[in-house]
Amino acid sequence: MTIDLNVIQSDIISARRAPENSLFIDGKFVSPIEPAAKPIPLINPATEEIIGTCANASAKDVDSAVENAYNTFRSGIWAKWPGKQRGLVLRKIAKMMREKRELLAGIDTINCGKPTPYALFDIDSCADMFEYYAEVAETDNPTVKVPLPNNPGFCAFEKRFPRGVIGVITPWNFPLKMALWKLVPAIASGNCVVLKPSELAPWSCLEFALICKEAGLPDGVLNVIIGSGKESGAALSCHPKIAYLAFTGSLATGKKIMHAAAENIVPLTLELGGKSPLIICEDADLSLAIPSAAFAIFFNQGEACTAASRLIVHESVADEVLGGLVSEANKLIIGNGLDPQVTLGPVVSKTQFEKIVSYIQSAINEGCKCVVGGLPRSEQKGYFIPPTVFTNVQTHNKIWREEIFGPVLAVKTFHTNEEALELANDSEYGLGSGVFSTNPKTLEFFSNNIEAGMCSLNNYHVVTHELPWIGWKHSGLGVGLSKHGYNEYMRLKQITQYVG
């Protein structure tokens, strides 16, 4: 049976309920007050065709959204609700997300190109996350009595409060999932949010906003603005009524946001780039390590901040590992993410496509050896990059040092564990890492000494909302996900009382 992908795409677009070129403010879809420019065209990266447009909000729209969120927060609706009451709404949102999973996943696929099974997984994991944070909110005790044995005339408490208006700026690689990683703990803890998703893939966030309204989230708790980072993102970053900023994106943009936040002394979390190392030791179970290494770089077209783009493999097993990687790369089915057989979709945009191609060309020019993949076919429609592996890589090569954000793997060999550790830590980034070995002491050595916020042993890597998401070095600040992430969106007060 032939699948008509054009019909599938048309059905997804027709099923959307968010009006074209709209923002979501105070529980309503609205047009920009004063657009910064013409609407932004949205392109399906698998076909290079324009499938619609989105709003291009100005600073005035940002101000409207923030003022609305601020007034909503100050009113006490939501912020002063008991955690159990907020939890009921969060659980209703989870239920409705599951009911709309095919639509939400389909929107993300036509916006950013990811294969449908991965997009569906994203939506399912987000619904699970709502359930998790519903339980956190329901069971959280924000007031804790602190014993003062040296001050018997006093009683003391630590009390946590929601911060206020949270500004959230998120990327295009996981359009809805990255937004909800920040949004869910923020609203679960009683805050109001102004969300600016990427203008390359904004539709699922707008559709999600309507789900929240229908689930009973009070108007003004979630506001969504769409526009360029230069205009609306910058305005959100420096708005004086923002109490906290949460950003996921590039290191360069993260530095700008940190500078803007500093002007108002606004705390923030930053999840920035990565150049994550994966180490395969001589005693590793290669039947596990090889497919894991392939998945770690080729998943989501390599458009993941934790993509293991540096493979450090023991010289004694290097040939077998490389042969296995070539085999795994050749198994991938490249094509339109709407096709259920596809396992590697296009990268998100022409800009990203050209950037990745330039890295591949740079590696070739610098003498690296391409063992699979390489430059894409020039006549091919769509922003497709073949899964690519380079050996003969030097540590000064761009593909070893810089984040590519595509399905491009750089491989180096090592002789001793100390040498592997030095290679792993020779990076400005410190987000993800992984080690494959059957020796517990080897695993302990690497997990204790790799300079990264997350380390996966004999896997790569478990991403779950129960565990904290942490970037070291230039990979970020603060903590996402888990109860630690929930507490990031709350401020702490010390209360003491004289009791005689």
Swiss-Prot record:
Pathway: Amine and polyamine biosynthesis; betaine biosynthesis via choline pathway; betaine from betaine aldehyde: step 1/1. PROSITE patterns: ALDEHYDE_DEHYDR_CYS (PS00070), ALDEHYDE_DEHYDR_GLU (PS00687). The keyword Oxidoreductase applies. Its EC number is 1.2.1.8. It catalyses: betaine aldehyde + NAD(+) + H2O = glycine betaine + NADH + 2 H(+). CDD domains: ALDH. Gene3D superfamilies: Aldehyde Dehydrogenase, Chain A, domain 1, Aldehyde Dehydrogenase, Chain A, domain 2. Coiled coil: none annotated. GO terms for cellular component: cytosol; nucleus. It holds the Pfam family Aldedh. The active site is at residues 271, 305. GO terms for biological process: cellular detoxification of nitrogen compound; glycine betaine biosynthetic process from choline; meiotic cell cycle. It comes from the Eukaryota. Keywords: Meiosis, NAD, Oxidoreductase. GO terms for molecular function: betaine-aldehyde dehydrogenase (NAD+) activity. NAD(+) binds at residues 249-254. InterPro entries: Ald_DH/histidinol_DH, Ald_DH_C, Ald_DH_CS_CYS, Ald_DH_CS_GLU, Ald_DH_N, Aldehyde_DH_dom. The keyword NAD applies. The record marks 173 as: Transition state stabilizer. Belongs to the aldehyde dehydrogenase family. This is Probable betaine aldehyde dehydrogenase. The gene is meu8.
